Amino acid sequence: MTDPTPSDVVLTSEQIAGLLPHRYPFALVDRVIAYEPGVSATAIKNITMNEPQFQGHFPERPLMPGVLIVEAMAQVGGLIVAQIPDLPKGLFVFAGIDGVRFRRPVVPGDQLIIQCELLSLKRKRFGKIKAEATVEGALVCSGELMFSLVD
């Protein structure tokens, strides 16, 4: 996956809120810059010092927790499946995480570019996405995320 230029807004934060169930402080996608429902999405997460996790992780050297980077990638994956026709309504949740690697710290002031691609969708209930997060073109996190539909 290659980084697109984050200039065009395909989905605003308000439109994202209409597609995902997450809300502050757990809404981790600021805008979508490339989107093909059922196939792929590229989104932006701006990392700011006023986010609540930095009060404790770590006050003297704030670092974005890796689990929140993975959650941001999962939310972008959720956008991919959010508009697939004939998909049952319900909540998609994590079912597994494979091969996730963290390559460098993410700090306030960084802009995560998150790219996700749907790898599989079985019985319209179980799926897998490939996800990558970069900052200024450098890979910071990658892996495969599995999800399942909860009725």
Swiss-Prot record:
GO cellular component: cytoplasm; membrane
Annotated disulfide bonds: none
EC number of this enzyme: 4.2.1.59
Keywords from the named record: Cytoplasm, Lipid A biosynthesis, Lipid biosynthesis, Lipid metabolism, Lyase
GO MF annotations, alphabetized: (3R)-hydroxyacyl-[acyl-carrier-protein] dehydratase activity
Chief location: cytoplasm
GO biological process per UniProt: fatty acid biosynthetic process; lipid A biosynthetic process
The keyword Lipid biosynthesis belongs to this UniProt entry's keyword annotation: yes
Reactions it catalyzes: a (3R)-hydroxyacyl-[ACP] = a (2E)-enoyl-[ACP] + H2O
Pfam families: FabA
Subcellular locations according to the entry: Cytoplasm
Active site as annotated: 57
Similarity comment text for this entry: Belongs to the thioester dehydratase family. FabZ subfamily.
The protein's role, per its UniProt record: Involved in unsaturated fatty acids biosynthesis. Catalyzes the dehydration of short chain beta-hydroxyacyl-ACPs and long chain saturated and unsaturated beta-hydroxyacyl-ACPs.
PANTHER family: 3-HYDROXYACYL-[ACYL-CARRIER-PROTEIN] DEHYDRATASE
Protein name as annotated: 3-hydroxyacyl-[acyl-carrier-protein] dehydratase FabZ
Organism, scientific name: Synechococcus sp. (strain CC9902)
Gene: fabZ
